[in-house]
Amino acid sequence: AAVLSSMTVSAPVIAGDTFVTIGTGGVTGVYYPTGGSICRLVNKDRASHGVRCTVESTGGSVYNINTIRAGELDLGVAQSDWQYHAYNGTSKFADAGAFTDLRAVFSVHPEPFTVVARADSGIRNLEDLKGKRVNIGNPGSGQRGTMEVLMDALGWDKSTFALASELKSSEQSKALCDNKIDAMVFTVGHPSGSIKEATTSCDSVLVNVTGAAVDGLVANNDFYRTATIPGGMYNGNPDDTVTFGVGATVVSSTATSEHVIHSIVKGVFENFDSFKKLHPAFANLKKEEMISDGLSAPLHDGAARYYKEVGLKIGRAHV
């Protein structure tokens, strides 16, 4: 697995340092730089708190949660819907049962469910995906999970498509522009390197994800929200794209110490202006929203302690 070299800045290892790893996603998504941004700020003050942070590129949300549960990751970035399902033992986590030791740390950027199609494919709305070659994402990724939820709501299955490929997020833009697929899906913060690649390497369009099935998902699930991808963000897409989405969240478990999580949260929140500049998807973040939006597992004790120390109001559900 890839580790961000910039996160392991050469410095003497202090006896007693605690090493922690954050699981992220594919290197072209926003989870990887999200983990890197967190680690950069944490490692800046490691001489005072003794926590050293590295980033691992992984298969995404579901993988991160399962690996935290297995005790092989300390923290991970995960979509808000998969945080909910893991804590409650529903959907993909029904067989494993409720992960009651899962803990929320904070939420990060909104993640619209994004459908990109080749301009010559004739795909202009959700229904047009029928009978086309669509990349539904690799098993274990958040986008694959969300695509399956959407397909279920629409009464679709893999046979709805001429081809349902299972490429990783880092592979799908090239496949689209090489005409191996007609459309790809990605649950991602914007602007995204992967979507930029797809819209600059070939003529491709963002597709509105709307209709009764989508309205029902948003109405019946607190972790979904309507979302808009601004027009003009990507080449050849001057108009707003309307869809639904989740949010990126940082999660851990009760197995990770209060000191470690307190140090990580403090590193981000006390360098907040710097954090917001580390990726365009962070530009509009607000501390008050980050400690509540999309969090369904209880707050980790280390996070809750920091928020109380600085006077940030925690919702009763998260104590």
Walk through the language-model features, giving the residues of each.
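Sec/Tat signal peptide C-region and signal peptidase I cleavage site
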Residues: 7-15
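N-terminal (or domain-start) structured segment
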Residues: 14-85
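Extracytoplasmic
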Residues: 17, 48-50, 60-63, 70, ...
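Bilobed "Venus flytrap"/periplasmic-binding protein-like clamshell domains
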Residues: 19-45, 107, 111-178, 273, ...
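Pocket-lining segment of extracytoplasmic ligand-binding domains
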Residues: 80-82, 91-95, 121, 158-256
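Short beta-strand-centered segments that line the small-molecule binding cleft or hinge
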Residues: 84-90, 101-107
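Ligand-binding clefts/hinges and TM-proximal coupling segments of bilobed small-molecule sensing domains
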Residues: 132-149, 223-284, 289-292
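An extracytoplasmic/periplasmic, membrane-proximal ligand-sensing/linker region
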Residues: 171, 178-179, 188-206, 216-219, ...
